[in-house]
Amino acid sequence: MNEINNILPKYSDAEIERFDSEDKFMDAYVELLKQTIELIYRVVGLRYCDPEGVPKKIDKEEAVVGGNLIRLIKLNTSFLQNICEGKLEICYIINRCIAETAINTKFLLIEGEERVKRNYIKNSLITEKELWETIITNVKDRSGDVLPIEERMQRSIQNSFDKSDFDLGEVKRSSKWKSIKDRANLVAGEMFYSVFYGISSHSIHGNWQDILLNNLKKIEDGFELNLQWNRPRPQIIDGAIILNLDIVKIFCERELQNDTTASLIIEKCKTLNDYHADLTQNHEKWMLK
């Protein structure tokens, strides 16, 4: 409890107003991102671990949400590392993954029903089923000759189905799991998909826009290759901070009702959200100078 009480804004409003360089804003943003990651750790510990911090046995429905929270933690720590190493291009890629994981987690928490979580699992097994069918076709074309790598792949696929409590015959080529756009619109609004998620697709797929902005330099009537990493600026961290705090808050409300520690964590989310808004506002003013 004391450790959670100690999660406080690093700088006061007056100190932020006196920032005279972007490095100072970056320091504040990085420390805030760390605190949001710590809050995710805290709710995971409250819900899925024993008093000693050892993970408890959980059922499949719990594992769907809990596993997504762990993915969110791992993505955030990798994001933080690349921020500190000054690798903006990698940050763009991880940022997109953070967004989709947060969307999935919030959707699963809001919908909450067993069928929704089952559709989430079933949808991920479609690709595995397609690979299984490709192997079967290839083996048939070779008159039943199975390659060692195909045997290993089939064992791996069967293992995934067994752990997920699905039979191969249950999974078809279509799924009732909503598209990422529909999930994003439901939990974050239409602008989120178009602006935050959609634009970040450039970095994931290596579209021309990503190549142009991050990997080339325009010179006169041609280009030069850009071998240097681009330096992250505070704005790249905004999305992760907002999403992390949103997920922590809704998780506490849905999964940790009447827990006094969870109530304190919700208060911390509000405090850090207000602090982030203050940072953002002052950084915007600073950029206009």
Give, region by region, the residue ranges found by the protein language model.
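Secondary-shell segments that build the walls of catalytic and ion/ligand-binding clefts
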Residues: M1-K56, K122-K289
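Long, hydrophobic/aromatic-enriched structural stretches that serve as scaffold segments
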Residues: V43-L108
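Short, glycine/acidic-rich hinge or "gate" loops at secondary-structure transitions
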Residues: C91-I93, L109-N119, N258-I266
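Short amphipathic alpha-helical surface patches that mediate protein-protein
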Residues: R96, I121-K122
